[in-house]
Amino acid sequence: MKMHISLKFLCAGLLIYVAVFAFITPLSPALLQTNLTEIKPGTHTFELVGYNSHFQSAGSNALYLINDSTLSIPCTVTQVADESHLTAEVILPNEMHSKAFAFVLNNDVDGTVFLETPLKVTDFTMNPDLARTAMPQFQHREAQFFNYPYQPIIMETIRNLMWHVPMWFTMFVLMIISFAQSIKVLMRGQRGGDDLLMPIQPERVRPHDNKAAMSAAVGLVFCVLGLITGSIWARFTWGTWWTRDPQLNGALVVFIVYASYFILRNAVTQEENKWKLSAIYNIFAFILMVVLLMILPRFTEGLHPGKSGNPAFSQYDLDSSLRTIFYPATFGFILLGYWMYHLRLRILKIEQAHENLLA
């Protein structure tokens, strides 16, 4: 069955949409760093660096040190150097409720942004009964433009989410097709109940064997792409091209297992034995892939999202702005993989027909 032309246009449209918006969409404004890490009571002047911020064009910037939703210490912005650099002053009293504070800034363009790194205060008097100064009720609005969420470690590499993860989803879909076709090979292409010792009927089995092999071949391509994009992502977030993470090692094992599937197919020359052995091997390869990539990571600790205590696709991994690109990317790559599978299958059929003519 050929892939309908409308699905091909849909695939191309989705991938063009993803390629454009995955790169042109900016990250949300954030506070990147300050030259203060630890201060004492008194008057302090400090610098604050923003990321994708609009300190200058916003006009007015409200800056506070906060401990919780009921306590704040106002800071005075003394100079705005440019869109991402400002200088401010804060006066810390001798008596306070807490020793840990965080910066929060609000303006009309960036909305409300926070500095994740806490500011530690020393040499002060702890007074839990001190009257609290409520934080001003400014509007906690979002930035005025569409953006991706800012995450301190991932930062701009969050765009790789639109490529890395959909490639693995595509691989899974193709391997499911290969798994199902391998089962049909063992069933002789009929509706079950056949004795496995009965002679194989080539006209019933060969189409399913072709589909199993070609879907696994294209799936292996996306496995390699997933490993490459994952390694690049790891380099910029974890500081290394590869780490001893259970899911990363499991993905590499999956690649080796499926690469061995094609070595097995090429090693067996007798067609009937090749069909049987390849189908049995492919079924076990799929089960191993599920165990290594979907089951074991849930019970082990590691850096990769999806581990115990580090869930994938949580509210921190995938917000509404990311979903508008991620879901089309996933569907688009799955369509691309399915399209490649059909093309590879047609090429194989032509090659086999040519061989039959020469025989």
Predicted regions and their residues:
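Immunoglobulin-like IPT/TIG beta-sandwich domains and homologous Ig-like subdomains
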Residues: 34-112
